[in-house]
């Protein structure tokens, strides 16, 4: 075993040397989505570091077929928009996210909240922020209103049959009945008091924890069923940095004819720092001030404020539920790249998110990175799903680089043979499409 590991270490060293000698043609990004909640009940992959696949091009090359017509699949700035937020047991954070989504100068037409915890407190919050009533309360009110109307009808009939009505009194009775009729219709009248520009809420509780992948898949399909022309992805622990984010994304999408556009994802506690390192050219950037220009084509941070055309989903589909958490964002990015659709990141707006850069460990003086999450639960999904991703079209040729980087990180930098063995086992599970979840 030691001899095999020594040979693998030597192979990693030589492969690393070849890679670093051709940095201009190979993208070394290794980022996948994450969660901050450890344990088997983790909500979704975007409740913490969601590290996007930060560059297109050589990382996941587009398929050789003719690129789709940009105009056909581009985001319609005048179309209906549904915001989709996936949450799990984080009511306080969700409240801040909902506040900023509802304050947008260009408000979404719907806000769909997928609740992986089916928590009544979340349902109450959604309707408190966006209007309407929780379904259980609304159903009870409707039943009570119907029963009250029935009692009124029966009472009126009994009164009419048992009393002698003097001449001319019928007109007065009818006059008295008029307010009663309008009172019975008051619930619908009250609903008209809600400002028409306020987003319409849709609360989707799930008694099965769908993870981030399944949560966004459900939310996307619900948005399509409503007739949304575009879907705006939001998160419960992140939020738009200001009230102009959605309007800015629409402007950029129209100008660039984009099927998908993302804001810059910044550190929620330090707006000048990126929440995740981003590679521009051959250099890894960690600060907003280090970025050049106002638009980065072919770069996307999905599920963190990204706006996606509904027509584009005819081609790229919805996130893969099997991945549950971590890697679903990278896999979705892979599909966008291979589709040939136009996409990119606007540097003129931001989505604030907790810092996720700590689990990306630099190697070779920062020229490359590997991912090492805290906790076995996070590592299980990160490395297993990464193995699956590396077996998919557009990413297979990066497999030697993947082995080299992680062998270097575990065997040379950390001197952690057990850690490398764990990585290798989980990576193999992913390549074999073994999607069982740990107990």
Annotate the PLM regions:
Residues 228-239:
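Short beta-strand-to-loop acidic/aromatic patch adjacent to the donor-nucleotide binding site
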Residues 391-439:
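Non-catalytic, C-terminal membrane-associated alpha-helical segments of glycosyltransferases
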